[in-house]
From Swiss-Prot:
Function of the protein: Could be involved in insertion of integral membrane proteins into the membrane.
Domain of life the protein comes from: Bacteria
Disulfide bonds: none
Similarity comment: Belongs to the UPF0161 family.
Its membrane topology: Peripheral membrane protein
Species of the source: Paracoccus denitrificans (strain Pd 1222)
Protein name: Putative membrane protein insertion efficiency factor
Length: 80
């Protein structure tokens, strides 16, 4: 992960450590939005990963989608 991606991951890690236990597990998606953000930053770097994480958080509301929503490019290889 790039240094800037590490910097962007700090608020996400702080949220998971401090706020998440108080808020509860109310994320509509799997993986959770914070796990998605960390994986997106790790896999795609600061710019694209930050953009993917921001888009995901904007979709996480009562009228948004739900269910399994993996980070693009993280699909498991198919076994034929």
């Amino acid at each position: 992960m790039s240094p800037f991606a590490h910097l962007l991951a700090l608020p996400v890690r702080a949220y998971r450590l401090v706020a998440s236990p108080w808020v509860g597990h109310g994320c509509r998606f799997q993986p959770t939005c914070s796990a998605y953000a960390l994986e997106a930053l790790e896999r795609h770097g600061a710019a694209k990963g930050g953009w993917l994480a921001a888009r995901r958080v904007c979709r996480c509301h009562p009228w948004g989608g739900h269910g399994f929503d993996p980070v693009p490019g993280s699909e498991a290889p198919r076994q034929d």
